[in-house]
């Protein structure tokens, strides 16, 4: 019976030794997994604790759905913790089943238990990556190119674009070199363009690949930085914009220059240009200029000269406003002259004309009025008297000064404010034709009558032109027996106004001048036949005129509506 138990004991002992040799003397790896990228399939495991220098690991691989494990002998390296299984899994991207793998530790004759991957290794386990990114700046735009992974072990037709044909997406991140904040952009192809940010000279770009139809993990590519230099700003676009701007500026400048040239007067032809003569001073100039002599008036000699000028022929009423005591005969033509067509008037003038009644002009001023005194012609008819019984001596109201009559003679003075520049003469010879009344404005030259050379009749014939006429509405009548003397004129100028009136000397004391209540027109034309001696009279007396008449009424007054001259009261006369 003992012989029967011996073979059984030997078999049990051998089994126990074999169990000890391949048993759990070594711990197994705790975790095994695949870490794969495109055509880079790496199997990783964790090492066992307290491993020695002689410890190594064995790896077995099988396809999913197959029971046979294939040992991978290239992975038996000392202390290695990973093994590249790419060559054993090249068909991974064409088969959907995947692979499984297991790992154990070996130390001399001791072995550990197998540790298998927890999940099946498929395409979804592949991590998506980008091999590199290329950036190029041109015309102010950044052109980027994404390079997918191109492993050398990749079989023909299994490129990244062929394996992942659809739904490829790339996420692009752009940031300044000195900042952490970035901007992202998504593209669906391996090329992209970026605009250079304003004020950015250096920036960095990185790309993250994605597949919209899978859940693969992805890794950012290596960041690529680009430094934009000054030369890169001079691109074709920038140069084109610069050239166009310069052309526009030059065009505007040319237009402005042309406009200025057109408005600017051109150069005259040489034939029309007269050169300025050179200044030369001849020894004997043809027309030497004589400077105006200015003489200082000697105040001591001046009174003597004034006395001499009083007795000279030049004494008279002039524009200077200075007068003398010597009587001056006024020979200036009257502003308003009666037409001499009436024969009775002419006859009366011829008979009554004598040097008895002549006036003296003393202290006459710019008003040009010469008032006469009958002292020089006493043989004439009735004397002129003041109407109100008083005389104006050296009147300054209108710069008209009157000289008193000689004692025993009637006085006649006229106020320049009332009479102005008006002198009225009687008509002349009947053979003269009717003349139209003419109105003068300004100054008329006055000439002096010389009583010694000619008689009063000759002076009237030569010096009194009949140029003016009365208005027909005036109704002035002169009686036939009226004989009134001609006014004495003084040398000088008589101021004329645009509108003025003339007064005629009176005749006999019983005859008077009458004036109608209506205003008589100075511009009217009257015929000499309508005038008669009986019509030369005035009807109304006007006190403000301050004009005197002899008793009996040679001249009562003039109308209040007569146009008077402006008062000139700025000059003063010594006498």
UniProtKB/Swiss-Prot annotation:
Its localization reads: Cell membrane; Cytoplasm
What does the record give under GO molecular function?
Answer: interleukin-10 receptor activity
Q: How does it sit in the membrane?
A: Single-pass type I membrane protein
Q: Which sequence ranges are marked TM in the entry?
A: 242-262
Q: Does the keyword Transmembrane apply?
A: yes
**Record InterPro entries:** FN3_dom (IPR003961), FN3_sf (IPR036116), Ig-like_fold (IPR013783), Type-II_Cytokine-TF_Rcpt (IPR050650)
Cytoplasmic-side segments: 263-575
Q: How is it modified after translation?
A: Phosphorylated. Phosphorylation of the cytoplasmic tail induced STAT3 activation.
Disulfide-bond pairs as recorded: 204-225
Task: Report the residues modified as Phosphotyrosine.
Answer: 443, 493
- A Gene Ontology CC term for this entry? apical plasma membrane
Q: Which domain of life is it from?
A: Eukaryota
Cross-referenced Gene3D superfamilies = Immunoglobulins (2.60.40.10)
Alphabetized, the UniProt keywords read:
Cell membrane, Cytoplasm, Disulfide bond, Glycoprotein, Membrane, Phosphoprotein, Receptor, Signal, Transmembrane, Transmembrane helix, Ubl conjugation
Which BP terms in the Gene Ontology apply to this protein? interleukin-10-mediated signaling pathway; intestinal epithelial structure maintenance; negative regulation of autophagy; negative regulation of inflammatory response; positive regulation of receptor signaling pathway via JAK-STAT; ubiquitin-dependent endocytosis
**Residues annotated as signal peptide:** 1-16
Q: Which residues lie toward the Extracellular compartment?
A: 17-241
Primary localization class, coarse: membrane
Q: What residues are glycosylation sites in this protein?
A: 50, 66, 113, 182, 238
Oligomer and partners: Interacts with IL10. Interacts with IL10RB. Interacts (via its cytoplasmic domain) with JAK1 (via N-terminus). Interacts with BTRC; this interaction leads to IL10RA ubiquitination and subsequent degradation. Interacts with STAT3.
The Swiss-Prot or TrEMBL record describes its family as follows: Belongs to the type II cytokine receptor family.
Role of this protein: Cell surface receptor for the cytokine IL10 that participates in IL10-mediated anti-inflammatory functions, limiting excessive tissue disruption caused by inflammation. Upon binding to IL10, induces a conformational change in IL10RB, allowing IL10RB to bind IL10 as well. In turn, the heterotetrameric assembly complex, composed of two subunits of IL10RA and IL10RB, activates the kinases JAK1 and TYK2 that are constitutively associated with IL10RA and IL10RB respectively.
Q: What is this protein called?
A: Interleukin-10 receptor subunit alpha
